[in-house]
């Protein structure tokens, strides 16, 4: 039958089919290798997809246990462990928390400063707003104020002495510092108070006066110890003859206050006699501020050219200005000693009264003490001028008022409202105050 030839064909077909399958498999090998190279190891991909990285507990890791941190902090078995590694972890956590808090505070301060700049402009705008009272000034030295309120006047804060201890070593008993608030007769002039008012004072009005009174107290010092008080606040040597004439205060309070006022005058004006200063103080009603102003006005009335020994200070002139006591003929000679900075520009007014811009004493005698800028602006007028008078572009105390030995051009004799006047209205014969910095031509000061 025809069944035999069909069987070989079927067997042959069955024999050919594995070869074709092998050929097809061989043909598909390069494609699978290329796919494996492009895909990378599938085992790592499956591990990354199945096990994402989660934060682990550091304390458990220190003890060889891996545990997820989520919901584990409260139930950690080593949460109270005090070993070295766990203690280091706690310290790191504390440091990181402090850093985060500091960064938050800095960011908050920067935001506040940025808001203030948007509201008021730059730093100059902030200063102008604070000067006009728009922004309340921040209280300074509150720590020292609270300490001084709790303790007595003799605090343990280190203080600096402005006066030489060797000149005061001859006194038998030290002078006790005034504990009660000082009255107006013990108020000292600005610029002569010691730094004790800033370091140990409570910031009140009588802090500077009390510290000035208690500063010349003689205290026992060690041999060879240098004190910062070898130079007085006036910039001159404190070892003058009048410094040795200090007397001990009487037991009564009024006499002690009077002696304190006399001591202040002798410290401020060491070149004047004590008797003359007592007369001036009595003529001014025992007001130290008025007495200092009277002495300064009399010194300014004589002119700056008389600096030799022939210049005399008369108590008659001082008492005549005080207008309360009869004239006296006591006179002294003044050595060449630098006076207070800006002293010759003061007037008969009190130092605490507002200055009038068009007052006659501003331009009365510009040759008395030429402390002015080349623009002719008076330093005191700049210091006490209001911002509403067209000087908002200048900050208060912008000029130099602490340079009594340098020669400046004399101020112009007009007020701020007359700034358009010609500069030729100056005194033609006025020269420089000193030949140290002024140009000299044949020993003659250069004319303006």
UniProtKB/Swiss-Prot annotation:
Region (Disordered): 166-259
Keywords noted in UniProt: DNA-binding, Metal-binding, Nucleus, Zinc
DNA-binding feature ranges: 57-104
Designated name of the protein: Doublesex- and mab-3-related transcription factor A2
PROSITE patterns: DM_1, DM_2
Free-text function comment from the UniProt entry: May be involved in sexual development.
Classification via PANTHER family: DOUBLESEX AND MAB-3 RELATED TRANSCRIPTION FACTOR DMRT, DOUBLESEX- AND MAB-3-RELATED TRANSCRIPTION FACTOR A2
Extent of Low complexity compositional bias: 229-239
The family this protein is said to belong to: Belongs to the DMRT family.
Subcellular location: Nucleus
Cystine pairings recorded for this chain: none
Organism: Monopterus albus (Swamp eel)
Ranges annotated as biased composition (Polar residues): 166-187
Gene giving rise to this polypeptide: dmrta2
UniProt record, GO biological process: germ cell development; sex differentiation
GO CC terms of this entry: nucleus
Gene Ontology molecular functions: DNA-binding transcription factor activity, RNA polymerase II-specific; metal ion binding; RNA polymerase II cis-regulatory region sequence-specific DNA binding
Every DMA domain range: 259-294
InterPro entries the record matches: DM_DNA-bd, DM_DNA-bd_sf, DMA, DMRT, DMRT5_1_DMB_dom, UBA-like_sf
